[in-house]
Amino acid sequence: MLGNFQRSELRIEVPAAAKAIRDRLVSPTDLSKWLFPQQLSFPNNEALATGTKFQSSLGPVIVEQVVDYIDDCCLRLRLSQGIDGYQEWSWGDGWVQSRLEGISLLPLNLYQTATLFRLQQALKPGE
């Protein structure tokens, strides 16, 4: 894999309960909405579960993702192709945290910041 090893960990406040955050992170329909303009391809429309494989793409960059672990307050994804590494989400009432580590040519910190901002916007009342 070409690129540099990068590590980023961000935590933000969100106007939502833990259940609402989880729902946005494990529903393929919700993920596709708030991660736009990324294109997501899921095997079905069921909630993510351990072992679920899916693909995301942004322009020519494709990232294969596999759900490594999931519970009521944590989601861990193994990443390959455009990013070789992992992303871990954890959350609680009023906050969400994302840790992203991997080798990539992409600026992962910028990607992660934009992703968290989009999630924060999607969790605002009325969204």
Where are these regions (language model features)?
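Beta-strand/loop substructures that line and gate deep hydrophobic ligand-binding cavities in soluble
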Residues: 74-127
